[in-house]
Amino acid sequence: MDLELEPTLESIVQHDSLKWIFVGGKGGVGKTTTSSSVAVQLALAQPNEQFLLISTDPAHNLSDAFCQKFGKDARKVEGLPNLSCMEIDPEAAMSDLQQQASQYNNDPNDPLKSMMSDMTGSIPGIDEALSFMEVLKHIKNQKVLEGEDNSNAISYKTIIFDTAPTGHTLRFLQLPSTLEKLLSKFKDLSGKLGPMLSMMGGGQQQDIFEKLNEVQKNVSEVNEQFTNPELTTFICVCISEFLSLYETERMIQELMSYNMDVNSIVVNQLLFAEGDDHSCKRCESRWKMQKKYLDQMGELYEDYHLVKMPLLGCEIRGVENLKKFSKFLLKPYDPKADSDIVFDLEEK
């Protein structure tokens, strides 16, 4: 039976139980614009709920997309009071982490402390680990808010992630299982090297390992939530070119191996030059190429929501421009009826 899904993200925007939405893909395909557009539509559709958009990409673009400065703490978007944004700063997070670790040992000459500092600074994927810690923090906050009335804290209905390019994102999503293995090795070390560690670290190592056990429980809960399609989904973003299509397929296969829900693909920068009296020969030639790969995507991902977004005449910056552009996530772009919007955005 041929079941063609709607070419929109309406099922995600209207979904009532989603807690986590990841937006990812190859570099330069419009992930930030797409994640910002999804966040804007969620905020517009549910004005009584609070939403948070987090950038985990070391090269942050959220501030540029909204024309508003964001930092490591959540800040409300001007013009959308129920949407907040934050950009995770790995250096600041690492500094906070080292300060927290120093409470267990104040001796600056301690060789164990020096060794741990060197290790954390050189571990591959430390940026992804720090981003994951931010996820753990929000999990913990949700638990507190669900357990008690705290009028000063904000409970976010859904958290949207503007992720780094594919490789970083896949490492980020591997962290739950990786951390469980790492924590298991730390447990083994505590048993074998316990007496020596106590001599070197002033007897505070037991507190550290107890803290790691608590982290392990939270990691397991995150893993459960990330693999629950009622709570988490992943939106793939690409452009209609061979390399982007190839990387999208690779990413989808990886996500499926992690048991993550992925059934939506946003294709950006489409020219829709067919039958356009204003298109040039170069546009027509490029649209012909785009259409070839669009047809391939239609066959390959017939059971996915395949959303086709137009290439506009200027940059999509600011809340008002994002509102105009993001409506095509819910209503398919019509080249004839909607062509005016291509040049109708406010320049920032």
UniProtKB/Swiss-Prot annotation:
Pfam families: ArsA_ATPase (PF02374). The keyword Lipid biosynthesis does not apply. CDD domains: ArsA (cd02035). InterPro entries: Anion-transp_ATPase-like_dom, ATPase_ArsA/GET3, ATPase_ArsA/GET3_euk, P-loop_NTPase. ATP binds at K26, G27, G28, V29, G30, K31, T32, T33, E241, N268, P310, L311, L312. Its EC number is 3.6.-.-. The active site is at D57. GO terms for molecular function: ATP binding; ATP hydrolysis activity; metal ion binding. It is found in: Cytoplasm; Endoplasmic reticulum; Golgi apparatus. One of its GO terms (biological process) is tail-anchored membrane protein insertion into ER membrane. Its main location: cytoplasm. One of its GO terms (cellular component) is GET complex. Zn(2+) binds at C280, C283. Keywords: ATP-binding, Cytoplasm, Endoplasmic reticulum, Golgi apparatus, Hydrolase, Metal-binding, Nucleotide-binding, Transport, Zinc. NCBIfam families: GET3_arsA_TRC40 (TIGR00345). ATPase required for the post-translational delivery of tail-anchored (TA) proteins to the endoplasmic reticulum. Recognizes and selectively binds the transmembrane domain of TA proteins in the cytosol. This complex then targets to the endoplasmic reticulum by membrane-bound receptors GET1 and GET2, where the tail-anchored protein is released for insertion. This process is regulated by ATP binding and hydrolysis. ATP binding drives the homodimer towards the closed dimer state, facilitating recognition of newly synthesized TA membrane proteins. ATP hydrolysis is required for insertion. Homodimer. Component of the Golgi to ER traffic (GET) complex, which is composed of GET1, GET2 and GET3. Within the complex, GET1 and GET2 form a heterotetramer which is stabilized by phosphatidylinositol binding and which binds to the GET3 homodimer. Interacts with the chloride channel protein GEF1. Belongs to the arsA ATPase family. This is ATPase GET3. The lineage of its organism: Eukaryota, Fungi, Dikarya, Ascomycota, Saccharomycotina.
